[in-house]
Amino acid sequence: MEAYLDNAATTRPSKAVIEKVCSSLGEVWGNTSSLHRVGMAADDAVSEARAIIASGIGAQKEEIIFNASASEGNNQVIKSFIREGAHFITTSTEHPSVMRSMEYAERSGVEVTRLKTDRYGNLDLDEFRASLRKNTSLVSAMMVNNETGAINPIDEIDSAIKESGSRARLHVDAVQGLMKLPIDVRKSGIDFLTASAHKVHGPKGVGMLYVRKGLKLESLVHGGSHEMGMRAGTLNVSGILGFAESIREMSPNINEHYNRAYQLKKRLYEGLTQVEGIVVNSPLEYTSPYILSISAPFLRGEVLLRYLSEKGVCVSTGSACSSNSTKDSHVLSAMGLSQKEIKGSVRLSLSPMTSDDEIAYALEAMKEAFSFLRRK
């Protein structure tokens, strides 16, 4: 028996996505910039895919830019706003691609305000309102935290920006929110939104960037006039079609999948909180049902991870993008966890493919692991 509970790192491509990618490699292999029939066939296929992905977030297809990943998109948005004397607002618990880009912006003369969170990763909206200034040009806040599942109040953040009279643009990293929470960029006032296909059972190496109509970003990759002049390079046609297929599959079932994920997370939550000493970093309420972060202060997370891996249970000690780093989680540190709680943390993350049997097996294996490792 195996239990894959590391879906926040990546997801298994669905059968329909695999079939779409494989068939398109042989059937729609043209360059979308070519004017002959082979190129036009590829361009038509990408145009249809663009419309499908746009509809999944309430956007127009002309507002979708394809790239290689959400990390690329995050870099592009932030670096496009860098100006000497500008002011950005972000949170202290962002993904490394945002965090490092903000550090780069600071070295380039931008002042960055990093909002603190409470013990469970929640923002203080009053602190956010007080941080807005006349020269604030960009606010960057993730929709769902990739380590804890904490959900940021994007609608309230947008309202606060508008009520203040600020001209700041709102960027949202929606990697852990796409196809997991309902997204309507129009209603939420989002100006830029980033996501990756491989987090929603699509292929790796393809991402999307929503750019609100009328806005423009600097290109990180210079060359041709691809993607409305905002991202040069020949398009990954098969990857894009696979991405669209994953959106087509998941979009009608967001609420159903959400409710099922909640029940699975509840089983994990109730089972693990029976273990003496376990600290829960992701409450059942007000967090994504797809992510559960816990801490076992009496052991090290990587020891538990390796033990579970031997048993066929796949979990992580935090962000996949930081798994090779020796530094403690900046997210859990910002939330005020102790060193033992941080070093003993593990993340369990679900998907619509997660089965009841996987949850039952993972719970059994984890309880066995805690009992065994506590004696070591």
Which residues are covered by each model-predicted region?
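Pyridoxal 5′-phosphate
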Residues: 1-376
